[in-house]
Curated annotation (Swiss-Prot):
This is Small ribosomal subunit protein uS7. One of its GO terms (cellular component) is ribosome. The gene is rpsG. PROSITE patterns: RIBOSOMAL_S7 (PS00052). The lineage of its organism: Bacteria, Bacillati, Bacillota, Bacilli, Bacillales. Gene3D superfamilies: Ribosomal protein S7 domain. Belongs to the universal ribosomal protein uS7 family. GO terms for biological process: ribosomal small subunit assembly; translation. One of the primary rRNA binding proteins, it binds directly to 16S rRNA where it nucleates assembly of the head domain of the 30S subunit. Is located at the subunit interface close to the decoding center, probably blocks exit of the E-site tRNA.
Amino acid sequence: MPRKGPVAKRDVLPDPIYNSKLVSRLINKMMIDGKKGKSQTILYKSFDIIKERTGNDAMEVFEQALKNIMPVLEVKARRVGGANYQVPVEVRPERRTTLGLRWLVNYARLRGEKTMEERLANEILDAANNTGAAVKKREDTHKMAEANKAFAHYRW
């Protein structure tokens, strides 16, 4: 924690094509070694693939996918009297979005398709249909929270 007080929150600029801060954040999450141009190209090609396959607006499909990935509950470790408990806590809206984007990118990278454009497009399509690895991650997170509901009174 900084001594000079809270750190000012940076606001991301919306991306040039879809004019969306959410898309801009996804581009930043995908970026490796500061290569933002490459990240943008991959994302826009993925959106083209989605539009081609579904016939729907890629932005709507992406928003639906993100909605299906974002967790509502998660567990946090809390030490009480020498024992660590996994305490279920509600996820703040900002963190929900961040986790959703992170899981989407991570599980897209782990997929088997040849190019990242295809991987990302397929992961977004799977998530929009409530399937895929990112949605499974959310379900697992919710299951953990449900299983540890007995420790909910340790919330802080």
